[in-house]
């Protein structure tokens, strides 16, 4: 897939975006393997509640990743929490729709959220924490000029082993 910004758009999620397919992603271990979502059993009710809670937040923004041509929800990217005093935020993301994984959509979403962070919120830095075994996420961050800044040794219990969290950052 060529690097085309118009392939996707980001839009704040609302409860109408919560459907069986979205909940199915969150309950699919292969999709959420490298996220903390793997520890929860999700339902339409619980996901709608989460979306409502995020919409109330002033420092976190849960955005859906949608295909532009079909308006299909394929994943999420979250900006926040934002630290307005120090002008930085964290990001987290995933492509839930398996047939759209490994096509560069996550990279495009990160590029778009970087632009939002810089222009709309006047942030100076973004941070992303990654399980050390999550090679695709490391690649997508590095493609977007995030730099490995450090790690927290043996932070997570992952598939029976302790692994580290890698901390990536990008300055604007």
Task: State the predicted function of each range.
Residues 30-51:
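Conserved GNAT-fold acetyl-CoA-binding loop/helix
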């Amino acid at each position: 897939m060529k690097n085309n910004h118009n392939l996707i758009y980001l839009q704040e999620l609302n409860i109408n975006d919560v459907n069986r397919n979205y909940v199915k992603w969150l309950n699919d271990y292969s999709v959420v393997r490298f996220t903390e979502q793997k520890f929860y059993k999700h339902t339409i009710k619980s996901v709608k509640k989460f979306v409502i809670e995020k919409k109330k937040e002033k420092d976190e923004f849960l955005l859906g990743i949608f295909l532009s041509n079909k308006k299909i929800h394929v994943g999420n990217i979250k900006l926040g929490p934002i630290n307005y005093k120090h002008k930085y935020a964290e990001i987290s993301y995933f492509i839930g729709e398996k047939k759209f994984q490994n096509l560069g959509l996550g990279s495009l979403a990160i590029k778009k959220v970087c632009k939002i962070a810089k222009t709309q919120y006047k942030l100076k830095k973004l941070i992303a924490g990654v399980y050390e075994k999550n090679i695709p996420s490391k690649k997508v961050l590095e493609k977007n000029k995030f730099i490995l800044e450090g790690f927290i040794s043996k932070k997570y219990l992952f598939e029976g082993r302790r692994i580290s969290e890698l901390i990536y950052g990008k300055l604007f």
